[in-house]
Swiss-Prot record:
PANTHER family: BIFUNCTIONAL GLYOXYLATE CYCLE PROTEIN (PTHR21631:SF3), ISOCITRATE LYASE/MALATE SYNTHASE (PTHR21631). The gene is ACU-7. GO terms for molecular function: isocitrate lyase activity; metal ion binding; methylisocitrate lyase activity. One of its GO terms (cellular component) is glyoxysome. This is Isocitrate lyase. Its EC number is 4.1.3.1, 4.1.3.30. PROSITE patterns: ISOCITRATE_LYASE (PS00161). It catalyses: D-threo-isocitrate = glyoxylate + succinate; (2S,3R)-3-hydroxybutane-1,2,3-tricarboxylate = pyruvate + succinate. Its cofactor is Mg(2+). Substrate binds at residues 94-96, 204-205, 240, 420-424, 454.
């Protein structure tokens, strides 16, 4: 065996040993270690995000064992990241926030993932570089402290693992892999990716969401894992499903999607698209076209195929219990499997008219009926390829979270779950508002080990900016002193002394190291106005 072959075989064996570690006990890979090694370069690169990924895994493992959650929110900038570091264990980077405030094209917009694909990775880098800087700054400051000062000054872990929004992957499988590579290089400990179609992606709390087939999303998850393996990192991947509220799907090619695709049960109707094309040719527009589509949908009596089979069996005289058994039996089967079961096991004589092509939209999408059962079905399919599962929801209903957790854990015991504590919900209107404080921890008991408010950084920024601007316009510096400076002092916010927070002492230390310990141009020397904050006012 040549030395090159021997080196290749040795690296393959090393990867195989790596995959047998507890870290990957739940992970399924449809490729071999040799596939991975053959796609690596000859220079081994160590990525800081790998350290962060391992840290995140250890953190969530402890929470899973204890039935507790790690909760966080979406950070906008280095200021928020350093404040979060004092109290929270992780940092979230939101695609929604990046779309509105940090697009790499500098063109803001809603959360449609129509910004350049490097937008969120760039925001991750922005925040991760700040984390690294403040970690260095703290270490230098502590090196100058006495033993007593060290004992009385808590260490802040600025290197909180970052989990970032990968949207739908921004394209095909190689686009997903390139996006994953960017996230690893920029410092993300983990990413999440959703099962929507790229060109029609919407915020999870918008209408008009279009799903991709189950296998297509599994391929994305596998692509992410393969990219991680090629880079030799243990970063995490969160599989999100938007199927709870989805109404469309791109294709019926995957048998596992069949039970949730709707079809017309009215054989007298022509296909919807034909009707709409004819109406447009007649000069119909806007509300007129919408009324025509609404009328067609109503007349079509859209049903899921198991429902259509159940009605047909009932019409043939089957008992209610027999019909219920049929529905239970075919509820997760493909169209052809469901027909075979209905005929052979339940004696169905006539397969009912049910046409899933007739209601297709002008874009060619199939009508889809989402819901919690659908989300459980998809999540269970994604579980072998992901570290955490996340069901996007319309409302934060604890009973629904329990149903989802139970449905997943019945198939995948101990599977880690994630939960979006979304600001898109009007929390004050919810029935469990009296248990608001307990909500996060109740979810933790169900296995939702990682939870996050996607846009809390945006909303907290908006709140204080609006409040301060209103009052500053009326009362001038009185507003700044009362709303900002005094409050910073009261809560111990270190940005009160913003020169020190920004690293001026650290920069002086660098300069003095170069010049032998003396500098007449030190930023924090005599004359710096920040010394006023050490005086009694």
């Amino acid at each position: 065996m040549s030395s090159e072959r021997a080196q290749f075989a040795s690296e393959v064996a090393e990867v195989e040993r790596w995959w047998k570690s507890p870290r990957f006990a739940r992970v399924n890979r449809p490729y071999t270690a040799a596939d991975v090694v053959s796609k690596r370069g000859t220079i081994k690169i160590n990525y800081p995000s790998d350290v962060q990924g391992k840290k995140l895994w250890k953190l969530l493992s402890e929470h899973a064992k204890n039935g507790t959650p790690s909760h966080t929110y979406g950070a906008l900038d280095p200021v928020q990241v350093t404040k979060m570091a004092k109290y929270l264990e992780t940092v979230y980077v939101s695609g929604w926030q990046s779309s509105s405030t940090a697009s790499s094209s500098n063109e803001p917009g809603p959360d449609l993932a129509d910004y350049p694909s490097n937008t969120v990775p760039n925001k991750v880098e922005h925040l991760f570089m700040a984390q690294l800087f403040h970690d260095r700054k703290q270490r230098e400051a502590r090196s100058r402290m006495s033993d007593a000062e060290l004992a009385n000054t808590p260490v802040i872990d600025y290197l909180r693992p970052i989990v970032a929004d990968a949207d739908t992957g921004h394209g095909g499988l190689t686009a997903v892999m390139k996006l994953t590579k960017m996230f690893v290089e920029k410092g993300a400990a983990g990413i999440h990716i959703e099962d929507q179609a790229p060109g029609t992606k919407k915020c999870g709390h918008m209408a008009g969401k279009v799903l991709v087939p189950i296998q297509e999303h599994i391929n994305r998850l596998v692509a992410i894992r393969l990219q991680y393996d090629i880079m030799g990192v243990e970063n995490l991947v969160v599989a999100r499903t938007d199927s709870e509220a989805a109404t469309l799907i791109t294709s019926n090619i995957d048998d596992r999607d069949h039970p949730f695709i709707q079809g017309s049960t009215n054989p007298s109707l022509p296909p919807l698209n034909n009707v709409m094309v004819e109406a447009e040719a007649q000069g119909k527009t806007g509300d007129q076209l919408q009324a025509i589509e609404d009328g067609w949908i109503k007349a079509a009596n859209l049903q899921l195929f198991p429902q259509a089979l159940a009605q047909a069996l009932a019409n043939e005289g089957a008992s209610r219990s027999t019909v219920e058994k049929l529905v239970a039996r075919v509820s997760r089967l493909s169209w052809s499997q469901a027909v075979a079961v209905a005929q052979k096991e339940f004696g169905l004589k006539q397969v009912p008219y049910w046409n899933w092509d007739a209601p297709r939209t002008r874009e060619g999408y199939y009508r889809y009926q989402g819901g919690t059962e659908c989300a459980i079905h998809r999540a269970n399919a994604f579980a072998p390829y992901a570290d955490l599962l996340w069901m996007e929801t319309k409302k934060p209903i604890l009973a629904q979270a329990k149903e989802f957790a139970a449905g997943v854990h019945a198939v995948h015991p101990g599977q880690w779950l994630a939960y979006n504590l979304s600001p898109s919900f009007n929390w004050k209107l919810l029935p469990q508002r009296q248990d608001m404080q307990a909500y996060v921890w109740e979810l933790g008991k169900l296995g939702f080990v990682w939870q996050f408010i996607t846009l809390a950084g945006l909303h907290s920024n908006a709140y204080i900016s609006d409040l301060f601007a209103q009052n500053f316009a009326k009362t001038g510096m009185k507003a700044y002193v009362e709303l900002v400076q005094s409050r910073e002092r009261e809560i111990g916010c270190d940005v009160l002394t913003h020169q020190k927070w920004s690293g001026a002492d650290y920069a002086d230390s660098l300069i003095k190291t170069v010049t032998g310990g003396v500098s007449s141009t030190a930023a924090m020397g005599a004359g710096v106005t920040e010394s006023q904050f050490t005086s009694k006012l």
